[in-house]
């Protein structure tokens, strides 16, 4: 079966979002997002409108980078993880599988967020700081 080159979704307000496949990995990138060509976006991952993904970043299968989120160079986002709207993931940070980074949260450079962890909306996670655990 031939793989589709793009997908379109219509939002409740009538806005049509068009997602094209990224050359490195085949994941879906919305036309108003910016993903560096050297970043890897796995086939079932989505990068939403206004999001930015830096060089060498890795977005795993079924991960979702929400509107306006930033994933800096060298960061890694685990399988089915969600980086919410406006959140920032620093350089070389590692977000584990199924982790959830809340809206407008900031995960600093080099920080490791464990699988299944939940970072609250607006939180700032620095290296060595306490992280919220999922219930």
Where are these regions (language model features)?
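Extended, small-residue-rich solenoid/repeat segments and analogous flexible loops
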Residues: 1-70
């Amino acid at each position: 079966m031939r793989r589709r080159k793009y997908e379109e979704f219509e939002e409740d307000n009538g806005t049509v979002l068009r997602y094209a496949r990224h050359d490195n990995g085949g994941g879906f990138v919305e036309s108003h997002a910016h993903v560096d060509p050297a970043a890897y976006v796995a086939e079932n991952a989505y990068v939403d409108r206004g999001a930015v993904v830096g060089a060498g970043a890795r977005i795993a299968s079924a991960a979702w980078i929400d509107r306006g989120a930033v994933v800096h160079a060298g960061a890694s986002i685990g399988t089915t993880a969600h980086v919410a709207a406006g959140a920032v993931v620093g350089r070389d940070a590692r977000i584990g599988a199924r982790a959830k980074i809340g809206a407008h949260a900031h995960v600093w450079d080099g920080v490791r967020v464990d699988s299944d962890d939940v970072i609250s909306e607006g939180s700032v996670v620095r290296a060595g700081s306490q992280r919220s655990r999922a219930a």
